[in-house]
């Protein structure tokens, strides 16, 4: 916009120019990501591969139902589909509502602009391109633009570049060439921490840097989740087995009872063809029944329940899961890309070490004159202040984070900075600027009753204006002591700390009363150096070690300098003495690499410094190309594209709305430690799903071959449709609840991440399903032959015993499935597992009710007490054999 000349920025836009600008460049609102409609959200649940197999099974079942006029099985499958999809839909919708509440943004914040020659306040959303905006300390910048005036202006860019304090200027000679954005550019979403200025708006809404990042963050990640890949494989396998067995059975029966029985050459009328057609239809329906039996209706239910329960439990530990799949995907991650500020560190500047050379008691303030000078110097020579303390909470600061850190240190020394500031009469003040690199304040001191000049700033600059150094009650020549101070500064810089030097001068009444003249005399006394750091979160080193021991690589991606990033990596245990330059890179150097060159380096990288948002996004995509499952943590808008493209995006609860919108999980407590916990939940969840598959497929294996072999030997269908409904749906649902509610185990963190290409059914699972399934099949087929050979054949009583025996085998097998993959006893912790106890009672109670009162609907007759006891005790061998195997395993492991 060129309607305003720099010389006339104090006039601003006219109302007509505002209207034209808004028409041309739009309003200052970020377009919110398009939310899927409720019906689309629900239809997404049908993308589950197993649900799709269920839909095919429901269609075949419906064909049989129409022919036989028996709809129980069809209704059962449809109920299973509706339950599985409905639960997933409800939990994601519920999480979405919670997220919207968490992420409420207020676009009505008032902004000072110059229009029609007057300063006026307007809502942030009404700012247009060309507006002249007045910026004050503590205010958020409403749009992107060019600075027209900058007086000691410092900006917090941590949500865009990771830098908490960036100095801005309009003097080209003072531009920071290494800065991510030009020194005279100021961006929406950043905050003025010190000084003031005036800007001309050049971009609003989606055209701002934050808007561009937000738009990138809405680009959808097309990477399928590890669980989805496995369920697709499983659904394909089940489909192939079901259709193969059904096709083979149909072919055998069709040849045996149709092709070899009927002479087709003698058929002349439709009536002649009818018997053959009826037999063909009967065998076709049997084949379809086999397909229906083969499909594990309870699998989507189990997966959904497991994910839903995890969502709820993780919310109770301050982790808001927005996307249900993220619960499980966390268990498969192999790489975590994390930013530094606010994630690894506390994003709160603190005094690490006060080094006032003349103070005694290890830098503790006392009642001596030097302590008084330090206290008054920090209090009066500052523009920051602390907000009033809320009982039980630390006071919060407003202003330059470095100055706030100094005030917080005074506060911790039980010094009332505000009282000192109010008592000290300011005679003259020189605010901090990038040109001077120091701040000076001349006050009439209430503590010593004299005029005192206080100076603070870059230590090397302040020391250069001193003639002596206050050291243990003596004055030492500043030139002689300079090398000692420089060595100290170098040590602090290597520890990724900011440093400030402090000096003072007692001014006689006859001397000048302006700071510029007094400082120019170069006869100050140097008080010492204060090291200020953004400390790492206390739980981060242990959390990083936990992730590394679990086989997960951690990479720091930050806008900070290489030195600072490396020091933070060292402090958290990521950077080791043996690491070299191949383990770190700058964003600019990374951008220059071709994809082939970058692919060779990405797995070795531990640190990317001076990174821009696009660098982080590219890193994530290249890691995925290398087969990594990537989680990204971040709290700034700059993290949003990478958060969205990663398999799991983890935003911080105190992060920006754009970052949270792009993430899958929001860590409400901002704790990096929660990531390790989420990995543990995810891995345990995957094991629970595997346990359910073991239990479920054993049932399906047995049921499939019972129907097939039972038909081959010519017996009555051993299990009716309604009985199969109980076994396949009701028991599966109970089992899903029981196995999904198993709490996470710390032991999973000692394992390496599974490969996303590894099939969900492991070798041990295959052996268990085939071994246990074959044993059950031999037993049950033996029962069928025995009952058929007995006088009276297959009576309803014998079929009831057979049905109950079959159910009780699965009942005891549930105990084995609960501890599958471990050497623990099936009874370990069961007294605390109230869910499991209730489900055991529900299955037993349900079976008793069906047998005793099911009658014709379930084709059962009541059994006496002794028969019940015989079945329950005889089938329990399943559990005792499992217990013996696990006991032997425990003994051999010792």
Predicted regions and their residues:
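Substrate-binding/catalytic subdomain of NAD(P)-dependent oxidoreductase enzymes
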Residues: 441, 714-728, 765-808, 815
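Conserved cytosolic headpiece of P-type ATPases
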Residues: 1-752, 758-761, 774, 803, ...
């Amino acid at each position: 916009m060129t309607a305003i000349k720099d010389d006339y920025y104090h006039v601003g836009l006219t109302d007509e120019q505002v209207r034209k600008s808004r028409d041309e460049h739009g309003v200052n609102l970020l377009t919110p990501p398009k939310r899927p409609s409720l019906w689309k959200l629900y239809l997404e649940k049908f993308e589950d591969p197993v649900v799709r197999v269920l839909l095919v099974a429901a269609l075949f079942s419906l064909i049989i139902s129409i022919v036989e006029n028996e709809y129980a099985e069809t209704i059962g499958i449809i109920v299973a589909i509706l339950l599985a999809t409905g639960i997933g839909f409800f939990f994601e919708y519920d999480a979405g509502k919670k997220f919207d509440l968490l992420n409420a943004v207020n676009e009505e914040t008032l902004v000072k602009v110059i229009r029609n020659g007057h300063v006026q306040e307007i809502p942030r959303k009404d700012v247009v391109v060309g507006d002249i905006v007045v910026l004050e300390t503590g205010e958020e910048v409403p749009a992107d633009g060019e600075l027209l005036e900058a007086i000691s202006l410092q900006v917090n860019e941590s949500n865009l570049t990771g830098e908490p304090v960036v100095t801005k200027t309009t003097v080209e000679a003072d531009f920071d060439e290494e800065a991510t954005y030009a020194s005279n550019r100021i961006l929406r979403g950043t905050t003025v921490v010190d000084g003031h200025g005036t800007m001309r708006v050049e971009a609003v809404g989606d055209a701002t840097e934050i808007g561009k990042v937000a738009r990138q963050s809405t680009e959808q990640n097309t990477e399928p989740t590890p669980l989805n890949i496995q369920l697709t494989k499983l659904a394909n396998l089940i489909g192939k087995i079901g259709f193969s067995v059904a096709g083979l059975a149909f072919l055998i029966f069709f040849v045996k009872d149709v092709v070899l029985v009927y002479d087709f050459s003698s058929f002349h009328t439709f009536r002649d063809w009818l018997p053959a057609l009826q037999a063909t239809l009967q065998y076709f329906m049997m084949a379809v029944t086999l397909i229906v039996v083969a499909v594990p209706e309870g699998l989507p239910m189990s997966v959904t329940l497991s994910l839903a329960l995890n969502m709820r439990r993780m919310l109770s530990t301050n982790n808001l899961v927005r996307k249900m799949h993220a619960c499980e995907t966390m268990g498969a991650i192999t790489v975590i890309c994390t930013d530094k500020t606010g994630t690894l560190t506390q994003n709160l500047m603190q005094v690490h070490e006060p080094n006032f050379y003349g103070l005694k008691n290890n830098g503790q303030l006392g009642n001596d004159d030097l302590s008084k000078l330090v206290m008054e110097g920090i209090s009066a020579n500052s523009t920051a202040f602390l907000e009033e303390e809320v009982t039980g909470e630390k006071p919060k600061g407003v202003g330059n984070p470095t100055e706030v850190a100094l005030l917080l240190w005074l506060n911790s020394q039980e010094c009332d900075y505000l009282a000192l500031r109010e008592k000290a009469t300011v005679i003259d003040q020189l605010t901090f600027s990038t040109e001077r690199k120091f701040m000076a304040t001349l006050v009439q001191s209430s503590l010593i009753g004299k005029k005192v000049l206080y100076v603070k700033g870059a230590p090397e600059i302040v020391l250069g204006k001193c003639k002596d150094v206050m050291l243990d009650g003596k004055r030492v020549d500043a030139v002689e002591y300079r090398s000692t101070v420089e060595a100290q500064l170098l040590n602090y810089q290597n520890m990724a700390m900011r440093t400030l030097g402090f000096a003072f001068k007692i001014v006689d009444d006859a001397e000048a009363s302006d700071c510029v003249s007094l400082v120019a005399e170069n006869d100050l006394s140097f008080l010492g150096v204060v090291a200020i750091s953004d400390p790492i979160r206390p739980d981060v080193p242990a959390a990083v070690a936990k992730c590394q021991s679990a086989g997960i690589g951690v990479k720091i991606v930050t806008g900070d300098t290489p030195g600072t990033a490396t020091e933070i990596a060292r402090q958290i245990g990521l950077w080791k003495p043996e690491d070299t330059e191949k383990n770190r890179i700058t964003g600019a150097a990374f951008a220059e690499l071709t994809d082939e060159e970058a692919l060779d380096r990405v797995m070795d990288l531990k640190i990317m410094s001076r990174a821009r948002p696009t660098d982080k996004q590219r890193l994530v995509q290249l890691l995925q190309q290398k087969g990594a499952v990537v989680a990204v943590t971040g709290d700034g808008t700059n993290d949003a594209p990478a958060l969205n493209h990663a398999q799991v995006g983890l935003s911080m609860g105190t992060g920006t709305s754009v970052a949270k919108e792009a993430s899958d999980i929001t860590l409400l407590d901002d704790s990096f430690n929660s990531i390790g916990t989420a990995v543990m939940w995810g891995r345990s969840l995957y094991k629970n799903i595997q346990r359910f598959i073991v239990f479920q497929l054993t049932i399906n294996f047995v049921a499939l071959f019972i129907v097939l072999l039972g038909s081959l030997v010519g017996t009555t269908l051993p299990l009716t449709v309604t009985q199969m409904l109980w076994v396949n749906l009701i028991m599966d649902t109970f089992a899903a609840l029981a196995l999904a509610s198993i709490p996470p185990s710390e032991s999973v963190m000692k394992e390496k991440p599974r490969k996303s290409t590894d099939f969900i059914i492991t070798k041990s699972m295959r052996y268990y399903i085939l071994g246990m399934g074959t044993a059950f099949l031999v037993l049950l087929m033996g029962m069928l032959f025995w009952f058929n050979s007995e006088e009276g054949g297959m009576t309803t009583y014998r079929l009831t015993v057979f049905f109950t025996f079959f159910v009780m085998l699965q009942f005891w097998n549930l105990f084995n499935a609960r501890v599958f993959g471990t050497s623990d006893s099936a009874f370990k912790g069961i007294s605390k597992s109230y869910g499991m106890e209730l489900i055991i009672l529900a299955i037993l109670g349900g079976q008793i009710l069906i047998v005793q009162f099911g009658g014709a609907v379930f084709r059962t007759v009541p059994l006496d007490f002794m028969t019940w006891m015989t079945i329950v005790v005889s089938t329990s061998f399943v559990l005792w054999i499992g217990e013996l195997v696990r006991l032997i395993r425990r003994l051999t492991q010792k």
